[in-house]
Amino acid sequence: MSKSYQNTIPLFLEEKQLRKHINKIKTNLLEPGEPKNPDDSTVFQIFRAFASVEKSDQMRKDFADGIAWGEAKYRLFELVNSELEEPRERYFELLANPQKVEKLLQQGAEKARSDSKNLMKSLRHAVGLRSLD
């Protein structure tokens, strides 16, 4: 999939849009019941990225048994949607609260400064660069 071809699936799409993007995935013309090669299928490749080994193995078997493309896309949508539901909610929560994002960034910066200050102090001591105070 390529962004320049406008065939990407942004991770934090709302459910309806996510379904629409998944349904647009190009597939070959093999009919239901005809064995399909999962290694040549974008649907399977994306499914495998989100699924457990067991689910991937089952889907691979279903491809060999000739799963219909509509069913394969439906299963892909269900899996991706369930995996991204919580992160999507968090994403929209953060988008709606820029003050919260700023606060989190400031807290992270303070922690990083504190950690790096202690590290730099020990590094200077280790290489013999001591304060002139």
Feature roles, as predicted:
Residues 1-133:
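Conserved nucleotide- and phosphate/pyrophosphate-binding catalytic cores
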